[in-house]
Amino acid sequence: MLTTMKKSSLVLALFAIAATALVTITYALTKDQIAYQQQQQLLSVLNQVVPKEQHDNELYKACILVKNNDALGSKQAMPIYLASLNGKHSGAAIEAIAPDGYSGNIKIIVGVDSDAIVTGVRVLSHQETPGLGDKIDIRITRWVDAFLGKTVESSEDKNWAVQKDGGQFDQFTGATITPRAVVKAVKRAVWFYKTHQEELLTLPLNCETK
């Protein structure tokens, strides 16, 4: 009986070692491809929120990490990608969190030109209700296009609210919390850029190259 148990333990140990080795080998073989795919996804999103005609630098490499919980919605440092055209600063793509979504955090990226006018907004991740709150996703509706061409005039700019709250942005039938959260997050990100642009341009590039 004892011999049988030892054999079983040995078989299990060998199986665990083999499984670990397989996972390690698989990771080693695929990590470069995964990193490449992530880089391509990032490039695609950056070019959607900061149009190609607005920059000629490698935007994903011109990245700084900024920590500002009030403006960017996270205690963690968030990436800001600095655009330039013909050697001059021409805008940015700012990642931020809307912490007050209906189902939790909504991660967004906001593109602006050097005058803090919005050039694009995309939702990077969310857990909002399908058929209701998920209309913030560009793959579902073009709702985020309502931000295009707009800027924030002050931290108290009342236009930056959903219509139910007296602002200019549509809410969704049966889902006001989600668009309200996104509008507030975009507003904070744009205002942060508008009031800190000179400071941001003095910071060293400190993101890991993706």
UniProtKB/Swiss-Prot annotation:
Q: Name one Pfam family in it.
A: FMN_bind
GO MF entries: electron transfer activity; FMN binding
Protein name (Swiss-Prot/TrEMBL): Ion-translocating oxidoreductase complex subunit G
Report the function annotation for this chain: Part of a membrane-bound complex that couples electron transfer with translocation of ions across the membrane.
Record-linked InterPro entries: FMN-bd, Ion_transpt_RnfG/RsxG
Instruction: Give the E.C. number(s).
Output: 7.-.-.-
The UniProt entry's sequence similarity note says: Belongs to the RnfG family.
Provide the membrane topology annotation. Answer: Single-pass membrane protein
Q: What's the top EC group for this one?
A: translocase
Per its Swiss-Prot or TrEMBL entry, what cofactor is needed?
FMN
Q: Which UniProt keywords apply?
A: Cell inner membrane, Cell membrane, Electron transport, Flavoprotein, FMN, Membrane, Phosphoprotein, Translocase, Transmembrane, Transmembrane helix, Transport
Q: Which residues cross the membrane?
A: 9-29
PANTHER family in UniProt = ION-TRANSLOCATING OXIDOREDUCTASE COMPLEX SUBUNIT G
Tell me which Gene Ontology terms the entry assigns under biological process.
Answer: electron transport chain
Would you name any one GO CC term?
Answer: plasma membrane
Subcellular location(s): the record lists: Cell inner membrane
List residues modified as FMN phosphoryl threonine: 176
Per the UniProt record, the source organism is Aliivibrio fischeri (strain MJ11) (Vibrio fischeri)
Q: Which NCBIfam families match?
A: PRK01908.1, rnfG
Assembly: The complex is composed of six subunits: RnfA, RnfB, RnfC, RnfD, RnfE and RnfG.
